[in-house]
Amino acid sequence: EAREAQTNPAKENNFRRYRLNQWGQQVTRWMPLHVWDLGLHPEHSPITEEPLRGRACFGGLDLAAVSDMTAWMLVFPCDEDDQAIDVLFRCWVPEAQLTNPRNKNRHLYEQWVRDGLLRITPGTTIDYSHIKAAILADCQMFDVQTLAIDRLFQGQQLGQELADELGTGPDGQPRVVAMGMGYLSFASPMKAVEKLTLEGRIHHGGNGLLRWQVEHVVTRIDPAGNAKPDKERSSEKIDAFVSLVMAVDQWTRHPSGPVESAYENRGVAFLSY
């Protein structure tokens, strides 16, 4: 069990609780990078827009409050394996972050901008109009079923504008869904993302920006065993990973979402006679 706990974060948390009696709120590293790299498949690398055009997908938007990074993630169920996903995402930072001497990551940002992995908005704070335009363009290019957006203050105005523009889907339900950022909202999709990662079913194309963020993800566990993503230092960014969890949450709620065991999230039912 101890050996398995070293490579599997879910088993590590259980091992700490039930074998080492380490209860309460725990913080552990989410996933070893060599496990994340299981999703790097030659036939899915790199992930580009054109092969995904017109395909059904689900979105997650993690918005920056002022000058931080904003991430917009799309997950596409694979045609050849409906339990796997191709992921495509956009990240933005204000242009001033590339020259801000207090930004420890500015050299990485410059490289990612050159590589086309990171977009900039003019000025010192994030410009939501650029994000809105990009999302609406993606909704024209791809068949975005639903998208999740932070229901807290960062998402209220933009979320309403997107909801007005995108309206409802074929099922009559809103295409823009407000999502909480707490343990209860993240517990189930975190399990789903973990399972997909361990099975090598998140096809990420080896994207360097996303991999850098995955390296910084820790899981914060509440006393009830619910997990949500977090980071240890402010200079570490996990926005793209958070948006991935949000997008996967939308996918798992859809009829075409992944099949899961009845025991994974619901536990065991007891019958009395």
Model-assigned labels for residue ranges:
Residues 1-58, 67-69, 85-130:
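Non-catalytic, compositionally simple segments
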Residues 148-157, 182-186:
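Acidic, metal-coordinating catalytic cores used for nucleic-acid/nucleotide bond scission
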Residues 104-116, 165-257:
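Metal-dependent DNA phosphodiester-chemistry modules and their immediately adjacent helices/loops
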Residues 66-80, 238-240, 246-247:
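Acidic, metal-ligating active-site segments
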Residues 138-146, 171-176:
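Short, surface-exposed connector motifs at secondary-structure boundaries
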Residues 68-73, 155-164, 187-191:
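A short acidic (Asp/Glu
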Residues 27-61, 140-145, 149, 157-165, ...:
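Flexible, glycine/threonine-enriched loop-and-boundary segments that flank and lead into catalytic domains
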Residues 248-273:
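Acidic two-metal-ion nuclease catalytic site recognized across multiple nuclease folds
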